[in-house]
Amino acid sequence: MAAGDNKLQALQQALNSIEKAFGKGSIMRLGEASAKLLVEVIPTGSIALDMALGIGGVPRGRIVEVYGPESSGKTTVALHIIAEAQKMGGMAAFIDAEHALDPVYARNLGVDIDNLLVSQPDTGEQALEICEALVRSGAIDVVVIDSVAALVPKAEIDGEMGDAHVGLQARLMSQALRKLTGVVSKSKTCCLFINQIREKVGVMFGNPETTPGGRALKFYSSVRLEVRKVDTLKQGSDMIGSRTRVKVVKNKVAPPFKVADFDIMYGEGISREGSLVDLAVDMGIVEKSGAWYSYKGDRLGQGRENVKEFLRNHPALAAEIESMIRGRTESARLAAAAAPAAGDGE
């Protein structure tokens, strides 16, 4: 026992000296009240995607990567996250390295463009320094970088068109992420990188697709979302939107590999009503018999599009159904978080 007491005393002295040197909270036991067990989140604007992420949205204080082919809905998802952060009273920033942000579309998605900070940097270094400065301020809830592929190193911009710049962008991203990760964690900012897709040459077997910017972002990201368009939504002969599938290919805060399907309507963004209909049917909240949908014995309409329109015209009913879906999801999430703790106590 004496040897055990000596060890504990030595450990406590070490902890005290660490806290004296680096400040209180620099080292702690994981289960202490000061160490948050439930991750703080920002909703994505799609209840289906919130459920697929397992925690109700994208995590604060973490790095998130959203990637996919062109016109798949990557920027739309990012703008919805910004809109949700603003609805919660937060501040958001959009670093537009592609110089392609459409303010009218952003407003249609619910973004308060008068209070959205926007930067259109000249070089990759400038973009990442602006990002770091915003995160260090501690006043930003979400910062979006669109996109990694457009973060051009200064040496490449200053050089000639045909010059080879092997690995410059990868080195830039690796250095920036080493600096950013700790700052992002302390500030509770969600740092969201949008990325494109490239194809590796000469791949015979397996997936030839990769993302630009080296491997650093893959490692440092707590969540990676793959966004793909799977179908086109039509009304008669008119194309009115696209059916989008998001796969959670990496998740450090919940079980990964879950998939969310939702509608993105052209000019409007993610269809809230479409996700409500799909999830309510899956959970048994709304009954589907043939083409008819009913809720608590009352018919909502015939056909999915008609039910979406009905919910759009009856926001109180839509809010009630959403509350039931989120309530069940949150109960399951809290039960999953409490299960290991209950097991430890036995």
UniProtKB/Swiss-Prot annotation:
Q: Where does ATP bind?
A: 68-75
Do you know which InterPro entries this protein is assigned to? AAA+_ATPase, DNA_recomb/repair_RecA, DNA_recomb/repair_RecA_CS, P-loop_NTPase, RecA-like_C, RecA-like_N, RecA_ATP-bd, RecA_C_sf
UniProt subcellular location: Cytoplasm
Q: Which Pfam families match?
A: RecA, RecA_C
User: CDD domains recorded for this chain?
Assistant: RecA
Keyword terms, alphabetized: ATP-binding, Cytoplasm, DNA damage, DNA recombination, DNA repair, DNA-binding, Nucleotide-binding, SOS response
Query: What is one GO biological process annotated to this record?
Result: SOS response
* Single Gene Ontology MF annotation: ATP binding
- GO CC, alphabetical: cytosol
Q: What does this protein do?
A: Can catalyze the hydrolysis of ATP in the presence of single-stranded DNA, the ATP-dependent uptake of single-stranded DNA by duplex DNA, and the ATP-dependent hybridization of homologous single-stranded DNAs. It interacts with LexA causing its activation and leading to its autocatalytic cleavage.
The UniProt entry, under PANTHER family, shows: MITOCHONDRIAL DNA REPAIR PROTEIN RECA HOMOLOG-RELATED, RECA
Family per UniProt? Belongs to the RecA family.
Q: What name appears for this protein in its UniProt entry?
A: Protein RecA
Query: What is the organism of origin for this protein?
Result: Heliobacterium modesticaldum (strain ATCC 51547 / Ice1)
Q: Which gene encodes it?
A: recA
